[in-house]
Amino acid sequence: MRTKKQIIFPKFQKLLEQMGENIKLARKRRELTSVQVAERAGINRSTLYHIEKGNPRVSLGAYFNVLRVLGLQDDFLKLAADDEFGRKLQDLRLIGK
């Protein structure tokens, strides 16, 4: 069964590209080569290249493993942690009861 290609709007593609650039900068600050990070993360160097370019087709697990190698795994927990919109919706429902 073929997987459906995900559509990413340009605005959000830019966010992925910025995240990839941040990961690349973190790697370079640690003076690690792409080969070193890829080996430690258990991925191909080409996958790391795609991560650093913000490719949306790379698995979330691969992103996590790269963050782990860079010591940034706690940043992964920040994704969707501050759900301000969800809290406002919840508050509105609670007030309405």
Annotated model-derived regions:
Residues N55-L67:
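Short, basic-rich loop-to-helix N-cap that marks the start of a DNA-contacting helix
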